[in-house]
Design a protein with these regions (language model features):
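Proteins enriched for Cys/Gly/acidic motifs involved in redox and nucleic-acid/cofactor modification
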Residues: 1-100, 111, 141, 146, ...
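Residues in well-ordered beta-strands of folded domains
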Residues: 22, 131, 282
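Short aromatic/hydrophobic contact patches that present stacked aromatics
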Residues: 43-45, 168, 201, 280
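Conserved SAM/AdoMet-binding glycine-rich loop
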Residues: 83-209
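Hydrophobic, well-ordered secondary-structure elements that form the walls
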Residues: 158, 199, 219, 227, ...
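Structural detector for short beta-strands of small beta-barrel domains
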Residues: 273-283
């Protein structure tokens, strides 16, 4: 392309902005879920979009603002899944803990608790499980429901991302390690046998060896439970992509391997806690 017809950087930005405005939805697209009768677990997306803008994440730019599936649609879709033979439904979303937040503008005051209640209200559903959500967005009444309702699985996936407060601030995470630990302790106090898993990102720009050492091993609670370890991956248009101290893949992979090795003892400890217990399996 010649310089004469190549768009200027300002023009390219204008074009991208216009395309984004045309393609970003403001309402949840209530698509149905495909069914396969030989499966026992189905995933139902009830929330789309994110407004957290973590500095490493491209999702808010790519997926747009918060949108939530209606309670009526949740009940309908869970009913269809049960009729198709599914025994467990996992409620998932991009920013699941913000379910219903944008609906307040329409006078509809609903939260993730209401979405879970809607799913549980469907006759024949044997289990309901939650996808990943932020620790700061776990409602006390949701925990009470989890403690009292046997069909709501006692499992929470709460991303930590780093055991270093400096890195958490740079990531624009909504907590520090002290607050995260307090929240996990509060959850365990209300639901003592809850299984808690987490995500950790290693190699974030500017993460020194000393910063990494605060996460290794293991990071602050939750434990004992396996960690999901990820190496930082640079994403264009995100603030983290502009940071000067970017590490190469070799450094990130080495740190991920060390964290995974430190995590090796957590899974056996979790399994040891189940010895002598009887639980239900879905087939």
């Amino acid at each position: 392309m010649s310089d004469k017809i190549k768009p200027s950087e300002a023009k390219r930005t204008e074009i991208l902005d216009n395309v984004q405005q045309m393609t970003v939805d403001t309402k949840f697209e209530e698509l149905g879920v495909g069914t396969e009768t030989d499966k026992t677990r189905a995933f139902l997306k009830i929330q789309e979009g994110c407004n957290q803008y973590c500095t490493y994440c491209i999702i808010p730019f790519a997926r747009g603002p918060l949108r939530s599936r209606s309670l009526e649609s949740i009940r309908d879709e869970v009913g269809k899944l049960v009729a198709a033979g599914y025994k467990e439904v996992v409620l998932i979303g991009i920013h699941l803990g913000c379910y219903g937040k944008e609906l307040a503008k329409e006078g509809k005051h609903v939260t993730l608790y209401d979405a879970v209640k809607a799913a549980l209200s469907v006759e024949g559903v044997q289990r309901v499980r939650l996808g990943s959500l932020e620790s700061v967005e776990v409602e006390p009444r949701l925990l009470q429901l989890m403690a009292e309702e046997p069909r709501l699985q006692r499992h929470l996936h709460l991303p930590l991302q780093s055991g270093c407060d400096k890195i958490l601030r740079a990531m624009h995470r909504p907590y520090d390690t002290k607050r995260f630990t307090e929240l996990v302790n509060e959850i365990r106090a209300q639901v003592p046998d809850v299984a808690i898993t987490t995500d950790v990102i290693v190699g974030f720009p500017g993460e020194t060896e000393e910063d990494f050492a605060t996460t290794l091993p293991p990071p602050p609670p939750p434990a004992p439970a396996p960690l999901h370890t990820f190496s930082y991956s640079k994403r264009g248009v995100t603030p983290a992509a502009e940071l000067r101290e970017q590490y190469d893949d070799a450094v990130n992979s080495e740190r991920a391997a060390r964290l995974a090795k430190g995590d090796e003892g957590l899974h056996p400890r979790m399994l040891q806690g189940t010895v002598g217990k009887v639980d239900e399996a879905l087939l």
